Amino acid sequence: MKLLNQSQVSEFILLGLTSSQDVEFLLFALFSVIYVVTVLGNLLIIVTVFNTPNLNTPMYFLLGNLSFVDMTLASFATPKVILNLLKKQKVISFAGCFTQIFLLHLLGGVEMVLLVSMAFDRYVAICKPLHYMTIMNKKVCVLLVVTSWLLGLLHSGFQIPFAVNLPFCGPNVVDSIFCDLPLVTKLACIDIYFVQVVIVANSGIISLSCFIILLISYSLILITIKNHSPTGQSKARSTLTAHITVVILFFGPCIFIYIWPFGNHSVDKFLAVFYTIITPILNPIIYTLRNKEMKISMKKLWRAFVNSREDT
């Protein structure tokens, strides 16, 4: 990504979550543990899905890709956030700031489309079970994943040029733990109304639209499973509950931040922490604790690993 901006500002100062060094030390310990667990948890899901023949299904293929996105989403800024907690002055370069913004919206866009793809997968599995393997074949699954990355790239690449070429000639303090469009663009020296419209139209409306589509899809699925057997209903509802929980946890903060991106919301930076640091660790917990197949496969994989170590 080429940065063409010739502003006087060469770096941004991040205020972080608190000015208390004691609290920052506690956050350093907490975020470090969360980050390590997030990476290991999502990595465990990926390894389990792609090394277990029983999980060679469209749903788990998409879940494995979602775990990769979550692991990457947790890594685009969190390591620097953790290191900054040990510093008095939290500084990020101009290029580094907009790289964070680009990656945030790229990965956020990919996750949105993946969640819609997972909803489509559940719709076909429950509403059209006889045609499931025909519709959700390997080519379709790969196409859904590739499409999610292309749309994520389009989503991020569309709005970045408008922001990166704004003139930043003075204020450079960002009231957050990392860079994001609403907080950075409001520091520009010119009227940013057009950029505000672009952000609301691109990030806000897309987030809200995807969320509504997902709610409608899962509502239709819940209506359909009423006609299933009690056993089928229980399994389907358990899976759907996990999916819906992830959708709400991810889209809730995004909609709040980007539908009203330039309001003075003191909670914005805490919401940013939630969907970039907390949500990626909740996804593997939600999907594994409510999924017997995943838990059984993880135990088998662990036993195989332990046995292989004992043999050597």
From Swiss-Prot:
Topology versus the membrane: Multi-pass membrane protein
Disulfide bonds, paired cysteine numbers: 97-189
An example molecular function term from Gene Ontology annotations: G protein-coupled receptor activity
Residue ranges annotated as Cytoplasmic topological domain: 50-57, 121-139, 220-235, 290-312
Gene3D superfamilies: Rhodopsin 7-helix transmembrane proteins (1.20.1070.10)
Transmembrane stretches, start-end: 26-49, 58-79, 101-120, 140-158, 196-219, 236-258, 270-289
Extracellular side: 1-25, 80-100, 159-195, 259-269
Keywords, comma-separated and alphabetical: Cell membrane, Disulfide bond, G-protein coupled receptor, Glycoprotein, Membrane, Olfaction, Receptor, Sensory transduction, Transducer, Transmembrane, Transmembrane helix
Glycosylation sites: 5, 264
InterPro entries hit by this protein: GPCR_Rhodpsn (IPR000276), GPCR_Rhodpsn_7TM (IPR017452), Olfact_rcpt (IPR000725), Olfactory_Receptors (IPR050427)
Cellular component terms (Gene Ontology): plasma membrane
Top-level division of the source organism's lineage: Eukaryota
Protein location: Cell membrane
Protein role: Odorant receptor.
Family membership: Belongs to the G-protein coupled receptor 1 family.
PANTHER family: OLFACTORY RECEPTOR
UniProt protein name: Olfactory receptor 4K17
Source organism: Homo sapiens (Human)
Lineage, uppermost ranks: Eukaryota, Metazoa, Chordata, Craniata, Vertebrata
Gene: OR4K17
